[in-house]
Amino acid sequence: MVKEISVGNVKIGGDRPLVLIAGPCVIENEVATMRCAERLMTICNGVSIPLIFKASYDKANRTSVNSFRGPGMKDGLKILKKVKEALGVPVLSDIHSIEQVEPAAEVLDVVQIPAFLCRQTDLVVAAARSGKVVNIKKGQFLAPWDMENVAGKAVSTGNDNIILTERGVSFGYNNLVSDMRSFPILRKIGYPVVFDATHSVQLPGGLGGSSGGQREFVEYLGRAAVATGIDGIFMEVHDDPEKALCDGPNSVKLEDLPALLKKLKAIDAIVK
């Protein structure tokens, strides 16, 4: 049985309906972030899907040193706190070093371990010791069963409020594929499982100085993943992906989100 976890006023896992984790790839500025969060809340209320808002304050693993990384931890957390307090929505962001855990945990409902860092024992343990829900993204280089040991590092602290997120596996150069067998394997570990439908269509470094993406496949992979009985869907969204400062090629346009969520919700209702 998959554990049910409370994230603020949202419950994920167990036999609960699908949860959406969504927001911009990176915090571009306060106005844009708040506007995105407000639109997401309106959309999710309209289709009755619980929302956890996500946005990164620092994209520490951008392809190029010249890529936009975000406002930084201090200013970024202030913006996320405003979103949380103004809208009453749980918030998620990623950490990249042990030093970031304590200040991040003061604001975030979910502390996220980036896929590239999921094997960093000290980081996973520190995040879990914060007492917050920890979303561990499966590395593009790991098999799904390898995540049992990763989850075990967090659980060793006494905190078993863990979410496991699949975001594709490396397939040759500049490409990722999503193996649908991963989801039942991950769920057998015992924690809620989320599919990152937008990073899974990323083409890492595919544009030379930045990553490309194939957002036209987000819906197809999302529908397939939800059909396996996953607990949540993770999507990066933007009102104008072509102008997004990070991961625009694989971000979902906000105006396209309601129709997609209705389809995913219908599939979720059938399989649960």
Curated annotation (Swiss-Prot):
Keywords associated with the record: Cytoplasm, Lipopolysaccharide biosynthesis, Transferase
Protein's pathway: Carbohydrate biosynthesis; 3-deoxy-D-manno-octulosonate biosynthesis; 3-deoxy-D-manno-octulosonate from D-ribulose 5-phosphate: step 2/3; Bacterial outer membrane biogenesis; lipopolysaccharide biosynthesis
Chief localization: cytoplasm
Superkingdom of origin organism: Bacteria
Subcellular location: Cytoplasm
Pfam family of the protein (one): DAHP_synth_1
Enzyme Commission designation: 2.5.1.55
InterPro entries: Aldolase_TIM (IPR013785), DAHP1/KDSA (IPR006218), KDO8P_synthase (IPR006269)
BP GO annotations: keto-3-deoxy-D-manno-octulosonic acid biosynthetic process
SUPFAM superfamilies: Aldolase
GO CC terms, sorted: cytoplasm
Catalytic reaction equation(s): D-arabinose 5-phosphate + phosphoenolpyruvate + H2O = 3-deoxy-alpha-D-manno-2-octulosonate-8-phosphate + phosphate
Entry GO MF terms: 3-deoxy-8-phosphooctulonate synthase activity
Xref: HAMAP family: KDO8P_synth (MF_00056)
NCBIfam families: KDO8P_synth (TIGR01362), PRK05198.1 (NF003543)
Family designation: Belongs to the KdsA family.
PANTHER family: PHOSPHO-2-DEHYDRO-3-DEOXYHEPTONATE ALDOLASE (PTHR21057)
Protein name, as recorded: 2-dehydro-3-deoxyphosphooctonate aldolase
Natural source organism: Geotalea uraniireducens (strain Rf4) (Geobacter uraniireducens)
